[in-house]
């Protein structure tokens, strides 16, 4: 028994023992290293959603502020325009016709405008082949109303509706206020002349005196 044990110990080399010790220590270090390393947590998907929601809220707030500012500016401009229109204008000023461009034309003046029946043979300087308001062509024997001064022609219904809220020609923007005032003045003077009764005329005839002469009485 003693001989066999001594032989087995003598046969083992010291290099093999050293390698076994290194291998066991390396395996222990590797085991400890794997236990120490913990898996890194994956990024949460809620972080991206929160960023997206914040951007959407910011954009919506900016749009809302812009809308409120535009509405406020629009209301301020309207108030300023209304206040400027309410300012009384001088009757003899140069801007008097311009301020009254949107007051419309009276019906009496509209009735005094010339109305013709359209035909292709009409050679009027301001008459076109279509109405500038409804953009439809004139038909033969159709009633067309001509505006004074510019002589532009339109359908009777179209121009009456237009001039109920405007005082200018829809084609050339010529102001009709002064023309309508002249027409109204002429109509008033003519009506006064027609209603005024004729005055009785008294004719005095003065005969010349006869020359004086002596009258002799004969018996």
Curated annotation (Swiss-Prot):
Keyword Thylakoid: no
Zinc finger (RING-type) residue numbers: 131-173
SUPFAM superfamilies: RING/U-box
Catalytic activity line of the entry: S-ubiquitinyl-[E2 ubiquitin-conjugating enzyme]-L-cysteine + [acceptor protein]-L-lysine = [E2 ubiquitin-conjugating enzyme]-L-cysteine + N(6)-ubiquitinyl-[acceptor protein]-L-lysine
Key words of the record: Membrane, Metal-binding, Transferase, Transmembrane, Transmembrane helix, Ubl conjugation pathway, Zinc, Zinc-finger
Enzyme Commission no: 2.3.2.27
A Pfam short name: zf-RING_2
First-level EC class: transferase
Domain remarks in the Swiss-Prot or TrEMBL record: The RING-type zinc finger domain mediates binding to an E2 ubiquitin-conjugating enzyme.
Official protein name in the record: RING-H2 finger protein ATL78
Organism listed in the record: Arabidopsis thaliana
Name of the coding gene: ATL78
